[in-house]
């Protein structure tokens, strides 16, 4: 019989059927108190049939691979990342009704009661993680673990202790593993790669995004530069591990010169990469900064209103925006469905052409397009 409006952390509809958010809920301060998943309730054999994962020889040959995630949050604030939709940034937008400064005041109320909101990333203890691996071994007889934490190379103290315990328990001989990392941490502390490899790690995947310092600083905002990327590649090769990297194109301020810088990086490192096309997921700063432009691509009437060519009642425009947002979010449900562009330089067809040129290392076609653009501006 509790009043739901007094329960923190809910999104609900009131008596007038209008949705509202209750106050923020404090995060769990001690992640060791979180119960392990009830693996016995899952139909795991369905998943084990698709265990092969082409990130390393060991992951590809695995027959009973499982994934696990221990990290909560992220120490970075990449503009494109949908994880921001589960972070303080999203809380600020929700509780401030789009005004992050206003929302921050409300979130700070929770800060006074619980310090977890002040921490960009949180982990359980390494012992908790090791016991989780043991549980997976005992209950599911797994032969490989994909640790989907995105920052194992960032928290050096935690990762070193995890690796020490992993070897101490003899797990490195029985269950190989792989994870994700970040270039700046590896560039500054390259020894972490050897530590992880010696503990059974067979792959580390990195989100490089672009090899243009301009794009990395202006658009991506991950806190990394091209020099970090090169140092990471060199470190991985020195440890006999294949550098696994992902890139994206179609960033707001990315032009052909920037794409040429990225292609130059690929060619120098003999890398074969099929880049993703930048997607402004809802909840990310990339979406909030380009919201009008994104929604106009799903309803051309909004573009006319935005350009002042049509004068429509605000309530009607609001309905159009909600409808466009619904269509956009539906498309985002399929990773293979291209959605909207945020590029200031290229149309959607051009992005697909450029993606093909990049994948084929076709610098000639890229330069040809650049010359065509130059001629058109004369």
Model-predicted segments: where are they?
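A charged, well-structured terminal subsegment
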Residues: 1-15
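Pocket-edge positions in alpha/beta enzyme catalytic cores
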Residues: 23-26, 121, 221, 251
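Conserved strand-turn element in the central/C-terminal portion of the radical SAM core barrel
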Residues: 181-184, 209-222, 233-258, 276-282, ...
